[in-house]
Amino acid sequence: MTNKIYNHDTDVDIVHKYNAIGLKGWINQLQYIDKEIDKLLNLYAQSIQNKEIPARTLILFSKRKETNKRLYETVMKYSNIYSKAAECDDIQCNMAYLSEYERLRKSYQYHLTRYQKLKTICMITYFRVFDLD
């Protein structure tokens, strides 16, 4: 499926194309989060050795990294399957793809919200320890 929109595309075709673009964006964001968590884990590991922040911080980020990995794998798998959405020839087929996309979108948004909250709380703690505010 090409993501270019043509005049003859139906509304459903256009939605599928936008969703395919959205999936690519999610994949890129989840890859970025994975790299960011690695950097934060290294930073926090050093701080834990110096007893500057609680060890629980490392555990929380490790768990979030695992959650991120699972979601990334799920989105990748679905992204590969989603390319077949253009082959749908009835509303039930289209709705199946769109329903799964919406379910994944909610999981993705929930994950981002949880990650941002964790990062904010941990950064506030980190800055307080070093009195950097």
Tell me the role of every PLM-derived stretch.
Residues 1-133:
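Charge-rich amphipathic alpha-helical interaction elements
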